Curated annotation (Swiss-Prot):
Name this protein carries in UniProt: ER degradation-enhancing alpha-mannosidase-like protein 1
Highest taxon above the source species: Eukaryota
Name of the gene: MNL1
EC annotation from Swiss-Prot or TrEMBL: 3.2.1.24
Protein's organism: Saccharomyces cerevisiae (strain ATCC 204508 / S288c) (Baker's yeast)
Recorded metabolic or biological pathway in which this protein acts: Protein modification; protein glycosylation
Swiss-Prot/TrEMBL cofactor(s): Ca(2+)
């Protein structure tokens, strides 16, 4: 007994010594408060330097400590003039960060400065700016700041010290931007002069002939909130029409090209994805559905997300594909797509969010930031020598756009994943991001991102999102006690990280009293809607004529093109992907571990799979992987479980079905790991694994002879496989490992109901209606591909 007590005392003394030796990475409340304070100090360092060296202009240059001004000499300088309208945009965009810091004195001081800057309460400034960017940065911040100033439950509530000036300014800017929607289609022009809001004669044609999907659709979110707060529905009606009209331009695969001519509706590029030019449409479909309790927006999100998973989803990211075919268009992803993991968290798709976020962590480990564009596939041309492949020449080839201006998207997703999982893995990332901001990006008068991640050259610019988003999300990551984390309101962050909520009284008043009385915009919408009805009638008549002709001259259904099944065999360049992590954080009864370090057995798969394009620049050679920081790894990993899968040796390819009927959203996942499809129409993309004995499979398991026992190759509807069915067992089999972007768990299967397009309702094929060469069904109800069973794909 005495011996046991001595052992226990020694253990306690050892643990106390370890704790005192290094409190870092324990993530106690004391430690998190220290990190939070450091972020707060960084924010005020940047903000105060802007006020001293940049105000009243739009930005401050962080290296040279002079204002960054609008380019008045060159009106075509889009990179500058689209955002810098000569209206102190850094001041306005930073207001909500001060509110989130819960710093009432500084919030009131900043609001007063805005009021003094615009004493007449209007933006009567001769500047041509981009409608979308000013909506999210100016109108969005003013609306959110107004909500903070008028909400008695918030720490920065201003009460009698505030008279609604920010809301009036937001409405004034909106009134200057809204004429951009007075086009023949109701889709907005990309730019507007906010002084001469009705005059478009000054714009060079090339500045007005293309608008991206995000810019045409997304202002709906801020403008709808403005309608709720002012009681004037014109903002909601006009911009919601544009959102719906933009969504209607999608292809038959429910994918949207990234940009259009707003008058002619012709697409400028066939490409689609989740990054720049389209990101906010998906974001505001889901966030608008939640904030406005809007089932139609939720349907847009569900359809769009399913289409993205089916056509764009790879193991670790969403690729840019052709909107009409779903085929890969370019072999790069951009930095803005890092936001999508956070959106997936909001949608409840946590497993996939975790995997997608990891891709951007590996980029940060490699480049010290997220390059604007990164090639995930090595370029074939020009051929490079071994020396070139390891140096700057190779980096030039894999980074089409090499800058990183401290964009917030990776910070944003890290924050949302931590809130959803409470995994210290994400706190550790935040600690390193904080360290990088202090040691690598903090400059004389602000924060300078990379002009070139290859050379490490810094950029003498601090865009407004550094203070309004990047530092805000980092602060919230460490602030467990922030009022936003304990609010009874449904708070939604805008795409510019401005918190939005709608008090019930505001909702009720708007629904009860709002009247659309503005004749200019109501008449314009009526004209646009009339054109839509006429166009729909012409399309319907055309379809009837074509259908009638086909019914006379062709045997089969009226729309042959839509019902011809297509099977496309493509070799997948991606190796197998991720598996789900355990939702809890405790292994055993005594110690806490990081689920990512202890359960996620593909944590380092990206490093090997993308080694050809994750090449460290010379200035990053001493930068260690964030997840392998010794202080963090030694404390939070569980040696018993922290293992990696053996890399698979099986061949992976894709099977693409284009079938008649409709695609089923959200198929049912049963407790026995079976995904069930009631219908199997539309497009489906199956990732197929070719199984051969003694290979390592997708899940890291050895394939044994037992897999090949009791295999049937007899097609119950055809004699095409009779010859091979009577011979020896097959040398390989097939297995589905992912379907429409959903990775099947180990021992998972797929069931397709018999009434789906693969079979008719009575279980027999109708050759006149449907024929797929190479597809059969055996007497185990397994689908067969060229007489080889897909052992986990059943027709039931």
């Amino acid at each position: 007994m005495v011996c046991c007590l001595w052992v226990l005392l020694a253990l306690l003394l050892h643990l106390d010594h370890v704790a005192c030796e290094d409190d870092a990475y324990s993530f106690t409340s004391k430690e998190l408060k220290a990190y939070k304070q450091e972020v707060k100090e960084l924010f005020y360092f940047g903000f105060d330097n802007y006020l001293e060296h940049g105000y009243p202009y739009d930005e401050v240059k962080p290296i040279s400590c002079v204002p960054k001004k609008r380019n008045f000499e060159d009106p075509t300088d889009q990179g500058t003039n689209d955002i810098l309208g000569n209206f102190t945009i850094t001041l306005i965009d930073s207001l909500t960060t001060i509110a989130i810091l819960e710093d009432r004195p500084q919030f009131l001081k900043a609001v007063r400065l805005v009021e003094r800057t615009f004493p007449d309460g209007n933006f009567d400034i001769d500047s041509t700016i981009q409608v979308f960017e000013i909506t999210i940065r100016v109108i969005g911040s003013l609306l959110s700041s107004h909500l903070y100033a008028t909400d008695p439950t918030k720490a920065v509530y201003l009460g009698d010290d505030y008279d609604g000036s920010l809301l009036r300014l937001a409405q004034n800017m909106a009134d200057r931007l809204l004429p951009a929607y007075l086009t023949s289609t109701g889709l907005p022009m990309p730019r507007r002069n906010i002084k001469r809001k009705w005059d478009v004669s000054e714009f060079p044609e090339f500045l007005e002939t293309e608008n991206n999907v995000a810019a045409m659709a997304s202002p709906m979110f801020e403008f709808t909130i403005l309608s709720y707060l002012t009681g004037d529905p014109k903002y909601e009606k006009v911009t919601r029409y544009a959102f719906d009209k933009t969504w209607s331009l999608r292809t038959g695969l429910d994918l949207l090209p990234m940009s259009f001519h707003p008058e002619k509706l012709t697409p400028y590029t066939p490409m689609t994805g989740i990054g720049a030019s389209i990101d906010s449409l998906f974001e505001y479909a889901l966030k608008g559905a939640i904030l406005f309790d809007d089932s139609e927006l939720m349907e847009v999100w569900n359809v769009a997300y399913e289409a993205l998973k089916t056509n764009c989803k790879n193991d670790w990211f969403f690729a840019n594909v052709m909107a009409d075919t779903g085929h890969l268009f370019v072999p790069w992803i951009d930095s803005l797509s890092a936001f999508f993991s956070g959106l997936q968290v909001l949608a409840g798709d946590l497993d996939d969010a975790i995997a997608n976020h990891l891709m951007f962590l590996k980029m940060w480990n490699t480049f010290g930031g997220i390059p604007e564009r990164w090639n995930f596939s090595p370029p074939e041309f020009p051929p490079l020598s071994p020396l070139e492949r390891s140096g700057a020449v190779a980096l030039d080839n894999i980074l089409p756009l090499e800058w990183y201006p401290l964009r917030p998207e990776f910070f944003e997703s890290t924050y949302f994943l931590y809130r959803a999982t409470k995994d210290p893995f994400y706190l550790n990332i935040g600690v390193h991001l904080l360290k990088d901001l202090k040691q690598r990006f903090k400059s004389n008068c602000g924060f300078a991102g990379f002009q070139n991640v290859i050379t490490g050259e810094l950029q003498d610019r601090m865009e407004t999102f550094v203070l309004s988003e990047t530092l805000k999300y980092l602060y919230l990551l460490f602030d467990e006690e922030n009022e936003l984390h304990n609010s009874a309101s449904d708070v939604i962050f805008s795409t510019e990280a401005h918190p939005m909520w709608l008090p019930q009284e505001v909702r009720s008043n708007y629904k009860r009293n709002a009247k659309f009385n503005n004749s200019v915009y109501s008449s314009h919408l009526e004209i646009c809607q009339k054109k839509d009805r006429e166009q729909a009638g012409e399309n319907t008549l055309s379809q009837r004529i074509v259908g009638f002709a086909k019914s006379i001259f062709h045997k089969g259904p009226p729309d042959e093109e839509a019902t011809d099944p297509i099977i496309d065999y493509t070799i997948d360049t991606e190796l197998p992907g991720t598996c789900s992590i355990k939702p809890h954080h405790v292994i055993g009864d005594e110690f806490w571990y990081s689920p990512m370090l202890s359960n996620f057995d593909r944590l380092f798969e990206i490093d090997s799979r993308f080694a050809a394009t994750l090449i460290k620049p010379s200035h990053m050679h001493n930068y260690n992987a964030i997840e392998l920081e010794p202080g963090f790894y030694n404390r939070w990993s569980n040696p018993q479980f922290s293992t990696c899968l053996i890399p698979p040796t099986t061949e992976i390819f894709e099977l693409l079905f284009d079938l008649p009927g409709y695609h089923q959203l959200n198929p049912l996942m049963l407790e026995n790991k079976t995904i069930t499809f009631e219908t199997f129409g539309g497009r489906s993309r199956l990732k197929i694994e070719k199984l051969q004995i003694y290979q390592i499979d997708y899940y890291g398991d050895l394939i044994t002879a037992s897999t090949f026992q009791d295999v049937s190759r007899k097609d119950i509807f055809s004699n095409a496989c009779d010859a091979v069915a009577s011979l020896y067992s097959p040398t390989y089999l097939y297995r589905v490992v992912a379907i429409n972007g959903r990775i099947l768990p180990r021992h998972g299967s797929v069931q397709i109901k018999k009434h789906s397009p693969v079979l008719t309702s009575n279980g027999t094929r109708e050759e006149d209606e449907f024929k797929m060469d190479g597809i059969g069904i055996n007497d185990h109800s397994q689908l067969m591909l060229e007489c080889t069973p897909i052992i986990n794909l059943f027709i039931v």
